[in-house]
Amino acid sequence: GLYHNTAGVPGFEGTTDGVEVRLHPNMPIQESTALWTFDGTFPPKLLQARYSESVLMRHYNALPIDVSANHGFGLHTLTTHEHNGHNPAESDGYANAFFFPGQFYDYRWPMVLAGHDSVNTDALDARAGTPDGEGGVRKIPGDYRETMSTHWFHDHMLDFTAQNVYKGSAAMMNYYSALDRGNEGIDDGVNLRLPSGTALDWGNRDYDVNLVLADKAWDKEGQLWFNPFNLRGFVGDVMTVNWLYKPYLDVRARKYRFRLLNGSVSRYFKVALMNQSGEPVPFYMVANDGNVMEH
């Protein structure tokens, strides 16, 4: 499903085909040529996957055939890279392996642990496993220390990655495993029981929130703007979260998990949590660029 809708605008929950996309309720409707996205939704949909269950993503390129229909930036040829995934070369989204509007490309992401052909090949380690859908774990080969957690996939077009990602061709992907199954209620000695929920066997997101942080810029008409001639690194002057300007999220008085993605072109972040009094709130870092950290 979509990331948490904090704007209260129903249009954010449907397709962008004829839907009025606003980055803030008081901002103008964005032109369709200014924003490109996955699967016709905005923000792009979240992909949830578990280990040992391969993902086949058929990516249709439905962008305009007219190369100038881009609001001044971005290229309509695409190649999709699943960042930090252990994927075969033909499905890695190499920068020159692009396809044109009207075409599609099939990406096969096998969802395997690193070292699956050399480490724990007999699949005896319970820490190397995947949810079985019935509250248990199915053991799999590979190195549990390389368990992935939070990924993203994005356009990887040669010379145009920054522009296409800036326009919206980027989405998050959650990996689920025996260590990180997305069910905080299962206590089997392996599951880390990170904040999530309990209704589903795996992949609960009641208290597990994906957040894409990105700086943007608008032109004088309030439309998304980018400077393609800035080769030193474009930096926007407005911060967004999940493509919303000044969003909010209603929460309960309990622990939450936030999966943060730096979706900016050049900017880096120092992230902190503050209470209403401006005092810092402590938090735990559980993963970094995909991998669950040593614990």
Q: In which residue ranges do the predicted regions lie?
A:
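Outer-membrane beta-barrel proteins
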Residues: 45-47, 143, 161, 199, ...
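Low-complexity, Pro/Ser/Thr- and charge-rich linker/hinge segments at domain boundaries
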Residues: 178-205
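Short, glycine/acidic-rich beta->alpha junctions
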Residues: 39-41, 132-136, 143-150, 157, ...
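Residues that flank catalytic or metal-binding motifs in active/ligand-binding sites
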Residues: 43, 53, 76-78, 101-105, ...
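Extracellular/periplasmic metallocenter environments
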Residues: 62-183, 295
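N-terminal, post-signal-peptide metal-ligating segments of extracellular/periplasmic oxidoreductases
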Residues: 1-99, 223-258
